[in-house]
Amino acid sequence: MPPPPRRGTSLGSRKSSLAAKRRKTGQVIRRRKSCQSFTLNHLSGAVSFTDMPFPYPVAHDVPLFLAPMAGVSESPFRRLCRRHGADVVVTEFLSAEGIRRENQATISKLRFGADERTIGVQIFGADPDAMREAAALVTDVFQPEYIDINFGCPDKKVVRRNGGSGCLRDLDLVQSVIRAVIAGTHLPVTVKIRSGWSEEMRDPVKIARACQAAGAAVVALHPRTRTQMYTGAANWDEIARVREAVEIPVIGNGDIKSAADAFRMRQQTGCDGVMIARGSFGQPWIFDQARALLEGREMPAAPGVEERFAIALQHAKMVQAYEADPQGAAIEFRKHLGWYVKGLPSSADLRKRLHQVNSFDEVEGIFDDYLRNRERWLADRADGGVGDATVEGATDGTVGDHDGSLEAA
């Protein structure tokens, strides 16, 4: 499939022509009244569940989702994860105000290729009118499979304006936002939530039921409160309770660092789908591994060094083809490189070199040097080099959890 258009290009005439067509025909946007029907089997294993049908195409009984992550789940990474087994991907979270004002930085993040489908577009905001208008524009111009509302972001800048998890302090507002988005699109409207604003207001079942009552077609739960941010453990028991309390599909999210975690979440909670965020960093093959476990097959081994480097370079070339600024793209890609080399011998030294690159050619050169001179790298490690015990910290200040993205780890 061809890659999506480079960033920085204009919307062109598509929006105006679709809007004109709507005015001419008097088209009225209505919420789709029924879900598409899919045949769903029980999960292989000791525990069986009756799965809820999703309102958009999914290829497996228990779909695997790539979480929306600011600065990470851009089109190239979404495409890569789809190739490695993700059933559904979601855009970075996007401001409804930015969309309706056609801010080019925001609009550029809405672009996706045909090979990314099934895809959802995630929007956030506390102004129902802005959310409705943004949903209408996204539907007309970009036509994803569904629109997701962000009620999970704990970022101060977002919640200060009552967006993201800030909405959870007012369930009437949550319902108003959901109904407004539904009024702006014929696509399924889904939500991503946290367990509440604070421990005192913690009630994920009440929140999920309110979302369902307003018309949400799917709910994804990250079982932490906003005040928890990323501390403590995600309370998977709350996913199970929400799953029992509502009649729409429930996606589990939070603390999935490995394929085994994804399998364990499904077993413990009965969730209809599993959403992976940080667990995909530097290992997009986690989806193939999780799929094998969910289907009762032996989990494939993680790629060796050479294959891992090949996947990283494939990712780099996809980014290079997508971004308009090659040097800026290479610098932005440094964080991914740090994740790809995590755990390798002398990975701290390797990461240090990779975090200084200014071009994708430099990346290939460093990888080639590592593969040709492994004995030297290992000797350097013996002389004091270390593995990558600190790679997780490399995300600090680099990747924001603007959709509950890092919260979905």
Task: Give a label for each model feature.
Residues 64-68, 89-91, 119-123, 147, ...:
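Hydrophobic faces of well-ordered beta-strands that scaffold small-molecule active sites
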Residues 49-58, 69-145:
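Glycine-rich, positively charged N-terminal anion/phosphate-binding segment
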Residues 69-71, 94-96, 124-126, 152-154, ...:
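Active-site beta-loop-alpha junctions enriched in small/polar residues
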Residues 132-163, 172-248:
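Alpha/beta enzyme core
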Residues 47-65, 70, 75-76, 184-186, ...:
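Alpha/beta catalytic cores of nucleotide-metabolism and tRNA/nucleoside-modifying enzymes
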